[in-house]
């Protein structure tokens, strides 16, 4: 059944709240707030004075009353500013939600009003969000198709709704039951939230951390220093798990790329293609210690190439992601990522090389093992336990695409 928002003046209950709280409209067009998003300060129009005193119990009527109240506030400049920040900084949907949530916390005192405001604003930005409540508390949910785990979920009307509030605030919802009203149909064209992050956000002036990496190749020790963006490291630590393949396309921050790629280019100078592949394999195999995600975190936690460079420990997925990135930047040859049952590896298109190979879209790819524990496997060789596993192509790279 469709639920329509009535187009009328504020209902009596809202009028009572206003009178009781001595509400005065005070949304000055010139009022601004600054929201911290890692090292960046994002300026937004303020909506001071638009908060209502909510009753102790949240009901469908209360939510709709607040919706209508916000409709009559000057919210459009706030929405436009958020949309501008998303476009200029390349923010994902999750980061857009984060900025909206932080802004609501700056402007409003009642955490429940903050959540209702987030719901209202995200819908105005074109994202399908819904509110579920259990009496005194209210939770922001959204349908999201690309979320695998890490969220409390509800299956409703053939869709899976993830609890954004619980994830952001690290709430334990195991024994919480929420009342689910009819979904809001306000005539706004909306889409499901995506956790996909195609590119790292463009954040200026991030704090830099340096990491000295030491590795061996053919018995010789090499050292190089990389400069990593602390914003990106923290951002990826905070970010919910999303599509596994996307981690292989995130790349490095400008600071990390500018320090790592030229240093490796210098080390690769004078080597032929196979020697370059062998050198890069030695780098990703021996510059880091190995530890499985389940032993480190208790669950799968893929890392971006920048995180792999920062942390002392990494696993097969992390090293494959870094090697996949380096082959694009330094070798410019076709590559595929292989997702085995219990392993991840990379294969490259290498002419005239024999060994274990995989065919994909008319090309032959030779297996290259990015993970240790030792640096002994030659190009085309595989560990026996890996060779016995089935594999799927997780993602691929072709120069020029």
Predicted features by range, described:
Residues 11-21:
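Bacterial N-terminal signal peptides
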Residues 2-11:
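Bacterial N-terminal signal peptides that target proteins for export
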Residues 24-401:
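A structural boundary/capping signal
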